[in-house]
């Protein structure tokens, strides 16, 4: 890969990061930051994404961390993404956090941007696909007509692994903003929730 192509990929990442972090319609349900293992050397190719699903969803009350890594040939190759926070979901591997999502696998196109990917992840939280599971146990419970047992497991994981009160660095006003998000994504999903 040429240095020019690598530079273009990083320029695009910076542009996407700036757009995502400055757009109030997005920034209310996702907090996005560079991964910063070394405070002196932040890395634009490694993002930490915070997701707080809106009130009224199965994952309400959870505080989820997602990791995104971008290879040198991004956007030719898809971002490598996984949930860092354990989550009980048909399409998310319980122990590794890997996500079964076509838009970051077989259907990836360089024309997709991170806003699209985050939108797809948000929709995946509302509309699971038990016919393509990474968590067979979750898929089995999800397929049952009465989802009480599945929802109890979701809440158990949310309380145990995604408890918002465990994150001291999150300000109370941020919690209120995120948990009551009125962004276009959340509004679209609420409007069409019954038709998914």
Positions of predicted regions on the chain:
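UBC/E2-like fold recognition across ubiquitin and ubiquitin-like conjugation systems
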Residues: 1-63, 67-196
């Amino acid at each position: 890969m040429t240095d020019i192509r690598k530079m273009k990929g990083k320029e695009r990442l910076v542009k996407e990061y700036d757009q995502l972090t400055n757009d109030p319609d997005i920034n209310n349900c996702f907090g996005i930051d560079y991964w910063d293992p070394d405070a002196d050397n932040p890395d634009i190719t490694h993002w930490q994404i915070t997701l707080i699903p809106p009130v009224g969803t199965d994952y309400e009350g959870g505080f989820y961390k997602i990791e995104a890594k971008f290879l040198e040939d991004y956007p030719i190759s898809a971002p490598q993404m996984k949930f860092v926070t354990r989550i009980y979901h048909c399409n998310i591997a319980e122990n590794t956090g890997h996500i079964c999502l076509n838009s970051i696998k077989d259907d990836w196109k360089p024309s997709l941007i991170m806003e699209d990917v985050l939108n797809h992840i948000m929709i995946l939280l509302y509309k699971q696909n038990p016919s393509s599971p990474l968590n067979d146990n979750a898929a089995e419970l999800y397929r049952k007509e009465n989802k009480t047992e599945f929802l109890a497991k979701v809440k158990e994981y949310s309380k145990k692994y995604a408890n918002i009160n465990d994150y001291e660095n999150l300000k109370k006003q941020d919690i209120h903003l995120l948990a009551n998000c009125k962004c276009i994504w959340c509004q679209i999903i609420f409007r069409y929730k019954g038709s998914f």
